[in-house]
């Protein structure tokens, strides 16, 4: 049975007019041929509304009951979409994550998908109906609702596509595809017809917002084609997929995009006992709280001091602040949080093989008078820390320095089967 999975985010479902517009997309695909399974997010603003209600009654940040409450948003969207499709003459059934067989780990608020049964989804598709599945949620081993955290609905869609062996997973949003920079801050940014999954994962991690890193990583592991398209246009979007290409890497443009992230905090930790390494204790604290670390710098040990620094999400600083202060104090040291920084990254392939790229990055920012600190390099990403208020200036400078507003790289046309992702 040929299957297509489509995912619609909160912005695409924010009003009834947008719900109907998304339903027309689904109807078009359903009438054209393959069976269609749809994954939906909560309607725009609904999750924030539910979080405010929980905060008003003093609910803990991550708990069983909060997950029960937040799951209402996606359930509302799924039922509303199924009702809309039914009114258009398209038979549809809404399924919660539990009903769709989505199994998760036990971490409330940030669970991982551990498996999908999908028997009821298959039964609906076999009966000619559209299966509308709630994203962002499943059930843990105890049978309790668990939400998936950042990127949860995208991850649900990719996991379902993998389980159903779908031809592709289409993710619909409000932009035309993956861009060479965020088009909201740089109108000259170019829509990319095709992006390698590894590069897309780096772009997502480094600040590209439309697709989450975990969704792309899962798609790459499971061989799922992903296409992100604009729900309001017929633009072809961006294909995120591996592709065979006979030309050597040296003939292609190595730099694909410039990304930025202002949800960044730089954390500086020091201790006065140079005989002890506090790094293992610091990273234990971060890991126990699910806090992702990016750039890391260490200096010392010196005669009387050991220092280290790293970046985390600014929005997660409160989660780890007290525990880090406690660890540092146990070493006779302290912690400083710098919240006034941004991260700008040049993303592509084979970047370490071209040492001139790091030189070009630093020279361009220096010429623009943008202070820099902490540079990190890999084959797919060059990242640098800049003052928060100069982040957009740095994006514009590097986009120009690497000539990313020019024509698409050779051979960047979408694969025949097509898939798209967007920044």
Model regions and ranges:
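A conserved regulatory-domain signal marking ACT and ACT-like small-molecule sensing domains
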Residues: 237-423
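Short phosphate-binding/catalytic loops that engage adenosine nucleotides
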Residues: 34, 90, 224, 291, ...
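Nucleotide/pyrophosphate-binding catalytic subdomain
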Residues: 1-216, 311, 385-390, 402, ...
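Short hydrophobic alpha-helical runs that function as membrane-insertion/retention elements
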Residues: 37, 168-172, 226-228, 294, ...
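Phosphate/diphosphate-binding glycine-rich loops and adjacent basic-rich segments that engage nucleotide
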Residues: 134, 187, 192-193, 202-263
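Conserved beta-strand termini and adjacent loop/short-helix elements that scaffold enzyme active sites
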Residues: 95-97, 229-231, 296
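A structural alpha-helix within SAM-dependent methyltransferase catalytic domains
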Residues: 23, 27-30, 162, 220, ...
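Glycine-rich beta-alpha junction loops
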Residues: 43-44, 175-177, 222-226, 230-235, ...
């Amino acid at each position: 049975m040929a299957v297509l999975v489509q995912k619609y985010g909160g912005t695409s479902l924010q009003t009834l007019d947008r719900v109907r517009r998304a339903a027309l997309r689904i109807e078009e695909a359903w009438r054209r041929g393959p069976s269609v399974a749809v994954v939906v997010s909560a309607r725009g603003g609904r999750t924030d509304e539910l979080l405010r209600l929980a905060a008003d009654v003093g609910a803990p940040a991550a708990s069983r009951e909060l997950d029960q409450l937040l799951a209402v948003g996606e359930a509302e969207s799924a039922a509303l979409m199924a009702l809309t499709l039914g009114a258009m003459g398209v038979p549809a059934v809404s399924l919660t994550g539990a009903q769709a067989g989505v199994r998760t780990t036990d971490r409330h608020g940030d669970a991982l998908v551990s498996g999908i049964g999908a028997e009821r989804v298959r039964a609906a598709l076999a009966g000619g109906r559209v299966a509308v599945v709630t994203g962002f949620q499943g059930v843990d081993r105890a049978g309790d609702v668990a939400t998936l955290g950042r990127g949860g609905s995208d991850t649900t869609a990719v996991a379902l596509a993998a389980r159903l062996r779908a031809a592709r997973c289409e993710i619909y949003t409000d932009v035309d595809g993956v861009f060479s920079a965020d088009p909201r801050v740089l109108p000259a940014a170019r829509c990319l017809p095709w992006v390698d999954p590894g590069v897309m994962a780096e772009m997502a991690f480094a600040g590209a917002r439309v697709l989450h890193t975990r969704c792309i990583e899962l798609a790459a592991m499971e061989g799922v084609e992903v296409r992100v398209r604009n729900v309001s246009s017929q633009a072809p979007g961006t294909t995120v997929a591996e592709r065979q290409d006979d030309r050597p890497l040296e003939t292609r443009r190595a730099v694909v995009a410039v990304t930025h992230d202002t949800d960044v905090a730089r954390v500086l930790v020091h201790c006065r006992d140079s005989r002890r390494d506090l790094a293992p204790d610091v990273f234990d604290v971060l890991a126990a709280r699910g806090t992702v670390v990016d750039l890391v710098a260490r200096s010392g040990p010196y005669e009387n001091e050991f220092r280290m620094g790293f970046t985390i999400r600014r929005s997660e600083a409160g989660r780890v602040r007290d525990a880090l202060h406690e660890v540092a104090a146990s070493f006779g040291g302290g912690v400083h949080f710098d919240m006034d920084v941004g991260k700008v990254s040049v993303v592509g392939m084979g970047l370490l093989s071209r040492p001139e790229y790091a030189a070009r990055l630093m020279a361009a920012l220096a010429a623009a008078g943008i202070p820099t600190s902490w540079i990190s390099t890999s084959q797919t990403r060059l990242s640098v820390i800049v003052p928060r208020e100069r982040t957009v200036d740095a994006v514009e400078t590097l986009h120009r320095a690497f000539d990313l507003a020019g024509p698409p790289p050779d051979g960047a046309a979408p694969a025949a089967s097509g898939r798209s992702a967007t920044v």
